[in-house]
């Protein structure tokens, strides 16, 4: 299951030092043979499970990189191994858009620029080398090849990548805390529309203890309410399967004016935001990307409605992203109000 997926590399004059991917795991070994020392590297493939469960009742497991490390003598059987360890490289994630040359073509929009820039991220300079276990020769060689100094190298006794822990639920669910379910505020009625309840009084939600559902319900009502004229919103981070974005798409498809400022430079969420920006545009939303040189961190949603010839506003402001998943994890506040002065202020912002 493992060996056929491995691609061992020996670094010599005919085989230059490979590109070590950001936060990938590698098994490294110093090899001796024919009066010379060489570096051998084996990448731990992402396609392999991070742990292998062992038979028995005690939920025992072994990490996949440990299995590969234990078999390096068979993988490099023509050589004698003097040192071996697991290594991982962290690369710079800060993209300098000017230096990346993504503003060269003024005919392209920011979304195209960001798509180009993200392709460059995986090739940015290393900023950290982590080693599980000290191996002085491997350390010296990797620091030289990666152009790192000793202060950028960390010798660890623990696993370098801890994502494997997410797989432990398959081994023993008793390891987990009891799951907490955010509650729907008892002062709100699930059976009645949320809009008139907001008109009666301000509603303040406290995540993650209270549910995001009242706000999602507000968006759903606005998307389908014939009296709603427009929805304007700023977005920094969205869930992968975002109900917020889907409600905005529905609103646009129902003929409402929907304007969304999508921050494409939300670090590590750039690709997700690019894809949602495309989907919002295809649904008929007007998507803008903010001001060059600035990031938009504000969380504001303005819904404009006409009833009996009068304009009404519902304004939502918050400290947290419009992300249903993280709203169950992070402490944030969400205020929904019908106060006209806040609605007028938000309208000025979006203009």
Residue ranges of predicted features:
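N-terminal localization/anchoring segments of enzymes in phospholipid and broader phosphate metabolism
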Residues: 1-351
